[in-house]
Swiss-Prot record:
Subunit structure: Part of the ribosomal stalk of the 50S ribosomal subunit. The N-terminus interacts with L11 and the large rRNA to form the base of the stalk. The C-terminus forms an elongated spine to which L12 dimers bind in a sequential fashion forming a multimeric L10(L12)X complex.
PANTHER family in the cross-refs: 39S RIBOSOMAL PROTEIN L10, MITOCHONDRIAL
CDD domains in the cross-refs: Ribosomal_L10
Function: Forms part of the ribosomal stalk, playing a central role in the interaction of the ribosome with GTP-bound translation factors.
GO molecular function: large ribosomal subunit rRNA binding; structural constituent of ribosome
Entry protein name: Large ribosomal subunit protein uL10
One BP annotation, GO: translation
InterPro entries to which the protein is assigned, alphabetical: Ribosomal_uL10, Ribosomal_uL10-like_sf, Ribosomal_uL10_bac, Ribosomal_uL10_bac_type, Ribosomal_uL10_CS_bac
Length: 166
């Protein structure tokens, strides 16, 4: 079905709004993936706070123009599925990576984070970013570990002083 000019403008505006509020973006090719599997992917994306849409490449180029995702223009060939992470930078990459493991025909093309282009082979960098809660937990563990080490060193120093005095 052909899109009218107004429909195209609406799509560009909608995707541009999503891009402006997004933390990262991932582009993929979903040729050969069944509708049922795509429906499950869309549902999972909504639950993860990821905006996902199949968009014509020319419209997508216009939508990301002037945003930090303009670096993706070179990979916009063939059928394009784009996902913008709104809540966590690695959400879309993690979602696509897990989906690609289960579906051989699903191909991740590239990603972008903070205006930096991320090739498909390096998408793990983005997918393995810790969530906010995970980062806080790691920080707390490091702080707790440091204070426990300090306590052990202090007790050892007191012991050494007592042994030297005796």
């Amino acid at each position: 079905m052909a899109l009218g000019l107004e429909d195209k403008k609406a799509i560009v505006a909608e995707v541009n709004e999503a891009a402006k509020g997004a933390l990262s973006a991932v582009v993929a090719d979903s040729r050969g993936v069944t509708v049922d599997k795509m429906t499950v992917l869309r549902k999972t994306a909504r639950e993860a706070g990821v905006y996902m849409r199949v968009v014509r490449n020319t419209l997508l180029r216009r939508a990301v123009e002037g945003t930090e995702f303009a670096c993706l223009n070179d990979v916009l060939t063939g059928p394009t599925l784009i996902a913008f992470s709104n809540e966590h930078p690695g959400a879309a990459a993690r979602l696509f990576k897990e989906f690609a493991k289960a579906n051989q025909k699903f191909e991740i093309k590239a990603g972008a984070f903070n205006g930096e282009f991320i090739a498909a082979a390096q998408i793990d960098r983005l997918a393995t970013l810790p969530t906010y809660d995970e980062a806080i937990a790691k920080l707390m563990a490091t702080m707790k570990e440091a204070s426990a080490g300090k306590l052990v060193r202090t007790i050892a120093a007191v012991r050494d002083q007592k042994q030297a005095a005796a």
